[in-house]
Amino acid sequence: MDEDAYAACRRFPTQAKPIIELSARDEGFRDLCADFATAEAELQKWRGSQHILREQRVSEYVVLVEALAGEIVSTLENASVVPFPRR
């Protein structure tokens, strides 16, 4: 599993299998996971910063991380396969 998908798995451990499977076959989802991993890393960096803009950046990254997490959930829900009923 790549590091970006692992970030999504850490956030949604009960969805690890679908995350890994979708990441393996969907480039857009891999990109979404990469954006999520980057945003989480930046959030942690800013939380540890002493910069004057720290609070502003932390607030911005919290919003971004939550939005990307919501997109991950939505993508996973939309990717669920519903089997056809047997005839």
Segments and roles (model prediction):
Residues M1-R87:
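Extended, charge-rich alpha-helical interface modules
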